[in-house]
């Protein structure tokens, strides 16, 4: 809510809220703070108020009329309506038609937890009214006049700076630097900066010369002050910094320069608004985009606990709502009154915003469901692969067992053929071998001896040993080749990863170089501006 005491524009600049002034007459002038101090009379043609209208107003407002209008306090009659309270529908129309003046004028609206005038009337916007100074010639001395109008020759300015204090203040606590910066007199600003005047002096509203230069959009003076080390994070009496005023002016280049010199992107004013929240509140879409790119906090809260999304919904800006939803902001966050962005959209009848929020919520639900389903599928796949591996291993074991008797039979046949070649009882062979071979029972003679693996100085042919060694060599070669192949594949994977890392490093270096180039370009532009100023100054000397 706005504060109770605030600066208001002149009464002539305020539109009449649905002929309320003419009907209430002098009571309007006496009872409404926004009309006090105006030079014009608010009386109707009759010179007094309309009694019938006042009776209707009192009956519909009920106890709110009794609390808000001093003319009703202490009267013997009750101002409460027939229902015992005020008419809500009438109060809603009154608030909607009067706008923020309702919040200023009616004490029953001040300090309440609920918003009575929507997103635009909740904050004190008087900080951004009348950015330039109101100057009267008779209130300024020679130096301040020269700084404000800037039409004094350079030699005379130098003489003035010698004779008077350059940091002297006027009645509004303004220095010559304040006046020159606010009015864009860059030559005077440069002279004062060269003589090392005080940079961060505060005027009667606690504003520095840099704040006034930003507020009045004097770019050249802003750059001069920043280069000489002016502090851009000093808040004024409203809590606004230079970046707040740049956002209010929707000056993206100014905001970029301030951030480059170290402005705090998360500083809050007395309403709890960061520069991003202020841009959303005032529907400055281009600056909001810029601040989002500069990684401003999208979850920052104002003094009512409202996020940027809730403020955008309250202002009815569908484009900013869509821009914030693209950044995956939290839709379910609540303010201090316990309301979400969707509830504000429904109560304000913003149908387009309601559709945007519902579509975003559906997409988020689909993402969550897909993320939850993926691990289950992975587990199923791994379990199926393991079962297939077990089946393959089980099938391979019977095959090996079936191959072993076939190998034994082949060996027995070879032994029988050798026995036939060398005769019935060859030299060096024991009798059990010959008996087993002649009887034809390979299982009784040769096979049991092979199973027990006790050779008894047998002299078998060398061909079997050579074949056995050759098989072992082939197996070892296969294993070596497989290990080499796996090593090669691992090396390829490592090289690919190294290449990816190198590409990522190149991208990072290119981005850093681009940012350095941009900074250098800005500095070059500043130096060129300084050279141009120097040329102009030298031309004045000549």
From Swiss-Prot:
Pfam family, one: Ank_2
Keywords linked to the UniProt accession: ANK repeat, Coiled coil, Repeat
InterPro entries (UniProt xref): Ankyrin_repeat_domain, Ankyrin_rpt, Ankyrin_rpt-contain_sf, CC144C-like_CC_dom
ANK repeats: 138-171, 172-201, 205-234, 238-267, 271-300, 304-333, 337-373
Keyword Cell membrane applies: no
Coiled-coil segments: 489-538
Region annotated Disordered, chain positions: 369-494
Bias (Polar residues) ranges: 482-494
Tissue distribution of the protein: Expressed in prostate and testis.
Ranges of Basic and acidic residues composition bias in the record: 377-392, 401-412, 466-481
Family: Belongs to the POTE family.
Protein name from the UniProt record: POTE ankyrin domain family member C
Native source organism of the sequence: Homo sapiens
